[in-house]
Amino acid sequence: MLRIFASLLAFFLAAAASAQTQIPPDSRLKTIAAAKTIKIAARPDAAPFSFLGPAKEQVGYSIDVCRLVVGSIQQQLGLDQLKIEWVPVTVDSRFSTVASGKADMECGSSTVTLGRMKEVDFSSFIFLETTGVVVSRASNIRGFADMTGKKIAAISGTTNQTAIAAQMKLHKVEAALVAVKDAGEGVAMLESGKADGYASDKLLLIGLHLKDPAQFTMLPDELSVEPYAIALPRGDWALRLAVNTGLAQIYRHGEIVGVFKKWFDQIGLQMSPALRITYGLGALAD
């Protein structure tokens, strides 16, 4: 029995060593494997995707997805454990934190764009969103076309800001687009009347902390398509492959359905056909 146990132990140790020796020397997987720790950048204010729970722990849809991915990476590297070290970031610092090496990946509500690919790489898509606008119910604003002469707040440097500017030009809506630093400033402008609307991803708008949510409503317009992904360091194909392998497993085995239901059943959101296709495309074969 002892001989069998020793043989099995030697086999698994050899398999783990083999998995780690195949990692390119310049990949962050080397550091991750050596430290048995992976650093994940996450925002505290992007509910329901990435935010702080009651005990100040990192929670959300994207956080749960990344926890499952980390479990897969642990298995791929043959590690007995792989701890997560959370790195707090803002909407402005999330990509530079990954690019500079302060974090190995970023999990939240980050939209993939060609411009952002100049700074970071991205995983397979993990969600699809759209840009929306929240306005006061007391206003006469019933659609985006009614925003002429109004002020629309959007976080500076986001795809929402770009989308609103493009839609204003496309539909000849002569509104003032006001840049804010974060969601808190956008909400403050909306509640004080300094802005007539606040633009962001629709589910982020649903998760806003408004003093009196009943006073506000979301316009029906869907003003852009926002494909979310995990941000990764540029050029690190081994880490990107490990992450995409984890995502493929989650999608193939159906674990993503449970994560989706956990976060979106409570607000009555059903999985759209487009999102089902997105998961299907990410369920790559080994």
Tell me what each language-model feature is.
Residues 3-15:
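Bacterial N-terminal signal peptides
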Residues 20-23, 29, 60-72, 138-140, ...:
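Extended ligand-binding regions for polar small-molecule ligands
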Residues 20-23, 159-178, 213, 217-218, ...:
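Ligand-binding clefts/hinges and TM-proximal coupling segments of bilobed small-molecule sensing domains
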Residues 21-106:
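Extracytoplasmic small-molecule ligand-binding "clamshell" domains
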Residues 39-48, 58-75, 111, 129-183, ...:
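Bilobed "Venus flytrap"/periplasmic-binding protein-like clamshell domains
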Residues 44, 126-138, 184, 202, ...:
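Periplasmic-binding protein-like
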Residues 67, 71, 78-146, 216-217, ...:
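Acidic, polar ligand-binding/catalytic clefts
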Residues 92-93, 107-119, 163-170, 188-224:
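A ligand-binding cleft/hinge motif common to bilobed small-molecule-binding domains
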